Swiss-Prot record:
UniProt KW keywords: Developmental protein, DNA-binding, Nucleus, Transcription, Transcription regulation
Family under the similarity heading: Belongs to the vertnin family.
Stated role: Acts as a transcription factor that regulates development of thoracic vertebrae.
Principal cellular location given in the protein's record: nucleus
Protein name per Swiss-Prot or TrEMBL: Vertnin
Annotated localization: Nucleus
Length: 658
């Protein structure tokens, strides 16, 4: 017995002794020690010098059960050993004999113990595998097996892990999943055309947990005793090999070895129209393998050509000055994924290929020396269009903050569509740190309740000498007002948008439109508009009554101060939400863009908190909802957010405190 076999025997003995202890704590500790011992030597990558040439015998029982939809030109072989012969079959397929079956058994036990949560819940095929476990002890589907709870399945898993430490144990379906991770290969689980209701759970390709390369495939068949025309009882596993391998083992060595399959694949790549008859006897691959390679090569060439044309189409559109939307791009190239589109788009913007995304005329007049100084590099390095574009955007934001003007991201994005949200907030945070005395310019308040002003009529008027000009001059230290180029860009609303806004406002003021229906019916309108109109519906009479209070005894200056105070109170009453809704601080000197942003954030936060609390309560009550049920209650929450919260709950995290 070699030193390797002695170490494996010692590891199995330690695991068998740890089985006698209660629970899995002792067994997990023994598995950690076994992992350190087994990691000192790796599994062989190729067949070594064994005891001699093996006599391959076809398993007639398994051959009679071999399904028609399984790979052709393959034969199940007889394997010697005890138990269900899973590890003996894998050792025979990998190294030509069953000499490493005990080591595969020990490594599989360690894999199942140290990654228990993955095989029970964290795997993509966990539901499929658990259904297969439910049916593994029966020949057909039954209500008893279908209704097994998760706690019972975990107990079966623990019992199977403990039994695997002994050579004569029965292997289940999760042993196949763990074995695939141990040998770093796909396992084609071949199940006979019997027990048809439960066959889809067993007849499938099982992939390893992690694999850094393209894995090969082992074919292992479920074999056993046929019961009737449609049923059979599983008893053992049989290794399945290709017919050419059996013929190669039994044939006498020829005078010259055939070229390896890689040579045939290289020849096929050089000559796409090559047929199998041209190869004749000078190839070591079968006819089906050859034509499968040729078909895959053609598909690969077509895929490469499609990606090439799609990327160049996107580059041309950028150079012409138009950003192709995602939907239009996918209609033209449906084979390209969304992530690939955004990766190419980000690459083009970052490398400066998007020359059409130029800033306005005022920003183009910025000198290159100022750009180079802001970058901290030479003017030659700063001459790249992408770098100059980003630096101008940064200087624009810093200049606005220096003028006490806080540009929201939506206005900033209209000028610089290539800048991401995170970059904007990083620049803004740094600029605010360099300007500790930053205070937004107070907005002009009129005495009276606020009326919805169309953006296209009054927001684009030029600044004139007056209250706004004086406020801007004070904010800039008595200098000239801020130039129009550095003001937030406001796009006038079209006629149909105004009609839509007026219709929504009328329904909200009438009290006939709840918030959830408002979001579904008017997705283009901001949630803050709903709450502003809702507060107007309740505070409007009070505001009107306050506006008409006469003040005959006040002087001219006192009357002006009273009107200013009364206007401030009206604005606060009009913007504040009703009782029971979210609080929002609104003052005469607050930026209206900031008010809208705060209300949007509060509305989004509240609905997210409600959705999180709902999922957390259902998770604690063991009745977690499906996405279909969840989307009926929270239709505005994305599917990815639902699965992210679900994964966090199953990982033991808490979504909402308290």
């Amino acid at each position: 017995m070699t030193s390797r076999e002695q170490l494996v025997q010692h590891v199995l003995q330690e695991l068998q002794e740890a089985v006698e202890s209660e629970g899995l704590e002792g067994l997990v500790g023994a598995a950690l020690e076994a992992k350190q011992v087994l990691s000192s030597f790796a599994l062989p990558t190729r067949r070594g010098g064994g005891p001699g040439p093996q006599v391959l015998e076809v398993d007639s029982v398994a051959l009679s059960l071999y399904p028609e939809d399984a790979p052709r030109n393959m034969l199940p072989l007889v394997c010697q050993g005890e138990g269900s012969l899973l590890f003996e079959a894998a050792s025979l397929l990998l190294w030509g004999d069953a000499g490493l079956s005990l080591e595969l058994r020990a490594r599989t036990v360690v894999e199942m113990l140290l990654h228990r949560h993955y095989y029970l819940q964290g795997m993509i095929d966990s539901k499929v595998m658990l259904q297969a476990v439910r049916y593994s002890l029966r020949s057909e589907e039954s209500p008893e097996m279908t209704s097994l709870p998760s706690a019972t399945l975990e107990a079966i898993f623990d019992a199977d892990v403990k039994a695997t430490c002994f050579p004569s144990s029965f292997s289940n379906v999760w042993h196949l999943y763990a074995l695939a991770s141990v040998v770093q290969r796909n396992i084609y689980s071949i199940y006979p055309l019997r027990n048809l209701k439960i066959r889809p759970y067993f007849n499938r390709v099982i992939r390893p947990r992690r694999c850094d390369h393209t894995p090969a495939t082992l074919h292992i068949m479920w074999a056993g005793q046929p019961l009737s025309g449609h049923l059979f009882r599983h008893q053992y596993f049989a290794p399945v090999v290709g017919l050419e391998e059996v013929e190669a083992e039994s044939a006498h060595p020829g005078p010259a070895p055939l070229p390896p399959p890689a040579k045939t694949l290289e020849l096929l790549n050089r000559e796409p129209g090559l047929s199998y008859s041209h190869l004749g006897e000078h190839s070591s691959v079968t006819k089906s393998t050859f034509y499968r390679w040729r078909r895959q090569s053609q598909e690969h060439r077509q895929k490469v050509a499609t990606r090439f044309s799609a990327k160049h189409f996107l580059q041309d559109s950028f150079h012409r000055g138009g950003v192709v939307p995602l939907q239009q791009f996918l209609q033209r190239f449906p084979e390209i994924s969304r992530s690939t589109y955004y990766a190419w788009k980000h690459e083009l913007v970052g490398s400066g290929a998007c020359q059409a995304l130029t800033p306005t005329e005022e920003l183009t007049k910025l000198p290159e020396r100022q750009v180079a100084e802001g970058l901290g590099c030479s003017s030659t390095a700063a001459s790249s269009p992408g770098v100059v574009f980003m630096q101008r955007a940064k200087l624009y934001l810093e200049h606005c903050i220096a003028l006490n003007t806080l540009v929201p991201y939506r206005c900033f994005k209209r000028r610089f569509p290539g800048i991401s949200r995170s970059t904007y907030y990083n620049w803004r945070r740094k600029a605010l740190r360099r300007n500790p005395s930053f205070k937004p310019v107070p907005a002009l308040l009129e005495s009276g309740p606020p009326q919805p002003v169309p953006v296209g009529e009054k927001a684009l008027l030029p600044w004139k000498g007056g209250e706004v000009g004086e406020g801007a001059a004070k904010a800039t230290g008595g200098g000239p007002p801020a130039p129009r180029a550095f003001l937030p860009l406001r796009v006038p609303l079209s006629r149909w948008q105004r009609r839509l806004r007026r219709a929504a406002r009328k329904q909200v003021l009438g009290g006939h439109l709840p918030f959830c229906r408002f979001r579904l019916r008017y997705p283009s309108l901001s949630p803050s508009s709903f709450w502003v109109w809702k507060s107007l519906a309740r505070s409007w009479p009070g505001s009107l009554s306050k506006l008409h209070i006469p003040a005959p005894t006040l002087g001219r200056g006192s009357r002006k101060e009273a009107e200013e105070k009364e206007a401030g109170r009206n604005v606060i009453a009009a913007v504040a939400p009703p009782e029971g809704t979210w609080p929002m601080a609104a003052s005469p000197g607050q930026d209206p863009n900031g008010q809208v942003l705060v209300m949007d954030m509060l509305a989004t936060t509240k609905f997210k908190a409600q959705a999180k609390l709902f999922l957390q309560k259902r998770f604690q009550s063991k009745s977690f909802p499906s996405y279909k049920e969840f989307s009926t209650l929270f239709p505005l929450t994305a599917r990815s957010t639902y699965y992210m919260w679900k994964r966090a709950l199953y990982d033991g995290l808490t979504l909402v405190d308290g």
